[in-house]
C-alpha cells in the first residue's frame, strides 16, 4: 500500500501494529482540504480503523462515536486495510512531504498496494 494523509499539525508515529498522530488538538488527523471534517484512527489486532467526525470543525476525538455525536457531529467508520496474516502492517517506509505539499505523508507498505483519499475525503484502495 501507499497511504496519503494530510496533517493539520503535529507529529506522526508508526510501528508494526499501530499508527498514531500527535497534534496540538489531541490524538488524531485533520483533513486540511475539508476543514469541517476531522478523522481519528486506531489500530488493533483485527484491522486498521478510521473514524471521521463531521460537522464539528477543528476538534479531534480520541474515542470517536459517542463524544462526536454528543457534540453535534456524526461519525463515519471505514476499515482502511487489513493486516498481513502475521498481524503486522509491514510498513516499509514513511516519507514526509515535498516542497509543494509539505503536509503530505506517504506510507509505503511492502505488499506494494495503494490507498488514497479522493476528492470527497473517502478512502479508496487500489
Task: Report each predicted region and the residues it spans.
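CBM-like, beta-strand-rich accessory domains located in the C-terminal region of large
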Residues: 1-126
Amino acid at each position: 500500500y501507499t497511504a496519503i494523509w494530510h496533517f493539520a499539525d503535529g507529529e506522526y508515529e508508526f510501528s508494526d501494529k499501530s499508527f498514531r498522530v500527535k497534534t496540538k488538538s489531541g490524538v488524531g488527523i485533520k483533513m486540511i482540504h475539508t476543514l469541517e471534517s476531522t478523522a481519528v484512527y486506531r489500530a488493533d489486532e483485527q484491522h486498521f480503523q478510521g473514524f471521521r467526525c463531521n460537522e464539528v470543525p477543528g476538534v479531534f476525538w480520541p474515542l470517536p462515536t459517542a463524544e462526536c455525536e454528543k457534540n453535534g457531529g456524526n461519525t463515519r467508520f471505514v476499515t482502511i486495510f487489513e493486516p498481513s496474516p502475521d498481524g503486522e502492517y509491514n510498513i516499509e517506509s514513511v516519507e514526509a512531504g515535498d516542497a509543494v505539499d509539505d503536509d503530505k505523508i506517504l506510507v509505503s507498505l511492502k505488499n506494494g498496494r495503494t490507498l488514497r483519499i479522493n476528492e470527497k475525503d473517502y478512502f479508496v484502495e487500489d
